[in-house]
């Protein structure tokens, strides 16, 4: 079992989606985690609602700082940054990490601020989910 950490700034949307996809669809090979460099302290309510409607279990999922993963209690095999801010920030040296991969994924939370339309909110969530899911699928195909 390999541990995968997804990092973004707020740990409220993109990294939460990625963690959820890993733990839902690839739980036989991977354990997903997420964290933020400046966590918001909560999962974005639109993303939370979207994932729950898709049947994802978010009981153990919460917004947290990446410092929680620097204590070596959990060996992280792969680290992904899923936003430019997290990629460009001074990130810690990850103990025992195998690789760091950067995916520049557009922030759905910024788009949510421009609408109150439930259909648009769902479309934004779905596009973000599909983007992340596709990247994870491609990465797993090449993961040895």
What label would you give each PLM region?
Residues 10-12, 84-87:
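Short glycine-rich anion-binding loops that position phosphate/pyrophosphate groups of nucleotides
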Residues 36, 83, 104-106:
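Residues at the C-termini of beta-strands that transition into short coil/loop
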Residues 74-75:
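Alpha-helix C-terminal capping/helix-to-coil transition sites in glycosyltransferase folds
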Residues 1-70:
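Conserved active-site segments centered on acidic
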Residues 88-144:
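Phosphate-binding/catalytic loops
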């Amino acid at each position: 079992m390999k541990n995968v950490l997804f990092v973004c700034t707020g740990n409220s949307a993109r990294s939460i989606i990625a963690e959820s996809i890993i733990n839902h669809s690839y739980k036989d090979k991977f354990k997903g985690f997420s964290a933020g460099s400046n966590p918001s302290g909560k999962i974005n309510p639109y993303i939370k609602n979207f994932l729950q409607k898709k049947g994802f279990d978010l009981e153990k999922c919460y917004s947290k700082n990446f410092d929680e993963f620097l204590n070596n209690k959990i060996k992280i095999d792969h680290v992904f940054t899923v936003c430019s801010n997290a990629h460009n920030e001074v990130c810690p040296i990850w103990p025992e990490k195998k690789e760091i991969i950067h995916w520049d994924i557009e922030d759905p939370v910024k788009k949510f601020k421009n609408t109150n339309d439930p259909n648009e909110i769902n479309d934004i969530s779905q596009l973000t989910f599909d983007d992340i899911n596709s990247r994870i699928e491609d990465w797993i195909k090449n993961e040895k």
